[in-house]
Each structure stands twice: as C-alpha cells, then as structure tokens.
Amino acid sequence: MENITVLGAGSWGTALALVLADNGHRVRLWSHRAEQVREINEQRTNEKYLPGVRLPEVIIGYDDLGAALDGVSIVVLAVPTKAIREVLQRARMCLAAPITIVAVSKGIEPGTHKRVSEIVTEEISEWLEDVVVLSGPSHAEEVVLRHPTTVAVSSPNMEAAQCIQDVFMNHHYFRVYTNPDLVGVEVGGALKNIIALAAGISDGLGYGDNAKAALITRGLAEIARLGCALGANPLTFAGLAGVGDLIVTCTSVHSRNWRAGHMLGQGKKLDDVLESMGMVVEGVRTTKAAYELAKELGVKMPITEVLYEVLFDGKNPKEAVDSLMARGKKQEMNDLMNIFAEQ
C-alpha cells in the first residue's frame, strides 16, 4: 500500500484516485479550491466533474499543496497543461525527497512546444526520481463506473514504468500495458484532441460517418507524421495511445473536444463554446502548439492547419472542410510508406 498524491481534482484526476483507492492505496487528492476539497471530505462527492459518484474514505481532499506532498514518493500530475508549470514551481518549494511523477495530462505547450514530460523534467529535475506518462482511451466517466479500460504507460526508465503499471493495474477493470516509446505515447495522447475537435465540427455540420471516418484515418496519419519527426516509433500510433485514444475521443459524447467541435460546427463562437463547457478543452491550445511545431519542422498537417484557421482566424467551418476536400490528388500508400520510411 502506497501513499499517493493526485494533483488536480478534475474528472480524470478524481477517476484515477478512485482506481488507486480500489487498488488499496491511500490517496491525497489536491485541489486549489477549498470548497471543492470540503465537498470531497464531507460529502464524499465531486459533483461538478463526476456527478453521482461516491468517493471512498481513503481518498482525502487537500487544498494545502505542501501537506498533500508531504512524505509521498508517487505524484500523479492531473492538472490542465496550461497550469502544469505553475503547479510544479509551487510543488518544488514543498518537496524534501525525490518523487516519481505520473503525468496524465495530454497536451503540448504553445510557444515552447514541449511535451508534459519535458516540462516536468525542466521544472523539478532536482527532485525528480522518474517521470512516467499514462495515456490511452480512458474517459473518466466510464472509469468511475468501473467499466473495462485499458491504457499504456511509458518512461525513459522502463523499470519505473513497470512499477507504475503495478500501482494502477486492476484486474477487474483497469488494464495497463507498458510501451518504451515515450515520445509516441505523449504525442498520440496530445494530438488526438485536435482531430476530435475536427470530428466534432464535421458532426456539427451534419456530415455523417463517412466524413468522420476519413478525418480519423487521415488525422492518424498527421499524428504519426509529426510524431515520427519528433522521434516516435510509428507503431505506437497503431496502439492504445494512438488509434485507441483517437477513436474514443472522436466518437464519444464524453469527449470535451468532440463536444466543443460539435458546437463550433453548429455555428457557435469559440469563446462562447469554451465558456459554456466550464472545463478545459485541451485541443484548442494543442492545435496552436502543433500548428507552430509543424511549421517549424516542415511537417504537412492539413487538418491541423484548417482547424487552426477555424479556431484562431475565424474561418467558417464549412469552408474549412471544403478546402480539405479540394486539396490536390494524393497517393495514399506512398504517404503511409513515407511515414514509416523515416524510421
């Protein structure tokens, strides 16, 4: 039994806290909102993020970051990517011994183009024992119902990945694989949110399953293209952190990114969509970061490019789809072979 801290009491952080509790661990669930912590400790609920879910007594809410981190060796990082640096900078001041960070947030930082594991290493290198990334098709709403879910973990230190595999593995409903391709696991988890936004727009426009299937398939090629340019193994994108996460995020009503895209396709403005969501839509920031990174590396990402124009340049969603359909002729097999030939 471990004492494990989860930083971030949103839907995913809370769901993983429940998995850890089911596995016999004592869990400290940290939030910067005191009223949310009181609800967790007094009502045993987190209604804003996971309505109707009762939390076991071994999950204790904390709003004091120092107290939440005191004496633990495993920390699950589940805050939105835009808050990661700030939280880690605060955490660094509270640590007294090295920790293993399990990064479960999915995104790429605009401007720096860094993945979450890189931000972690940059901010707390002196206190970092290991960094492990957990990713895969895993909506929190289904995890808390204990529906079968399968994810992958990766790390520069595969012994650390195997340790975290053991910590999270639940033989009833939460299966964990290891994957040595850290870059691929992170890139797949981050970029699938871009394609989910596009799939939501397509559904909002009423284009049906054919269009969405094409977006998912060609979107996977874009993800692999950028991932391989960053050093990923293309086979990762055929696995849980690639096509697995992509399918669930593009097709499920639980997907925030799909829902946001759906509203955009129906004609709503981005600011209004984000306000109505009330939760972070990681794909918006990731679209900006991936667009910048693709330009820097000379990687062609046409879906990402037109989505960027919709989100940040005000392009009409229907015109964006029309521009994708009007692109020049391509040979699909050559495109796929080029992705694999880079390895």
Curated annotation (Swiss-Prot):
GO process annotations (BP): carbohydrate metabolic process; glycerol-3-phosphate biosynthetic process; glycerol-3-phosphate catabolic process; glycerophospholipid metabolic process; phospholipid biosynthetic process
Residues given in the record as sn-glycerol 3-phosphate binding sites: K106, G136, S138, K192, D245, S255, R256, N257
Positions annotated to bind NADPH: S11, W12, H32, R33, K106, A140, R256, V280, E282
Enzyme class: oxidoreductase
Record: active site: K192
Subcellular localization(s) per the UniProt record: Cytoplasm
Source superkingdom: Bacteria
Pathway as given in its UniProt record: Membrane lipid metabolism; glycerophospholipid metabolism
Protein name (record): Glycerol-3-phosphate dehydrogenase [NAD(P)+]
Source taxonomy: Bacteria, Bacillati, Bacillota, Bacilli, Bacillales
Gene for this chain: gpsA
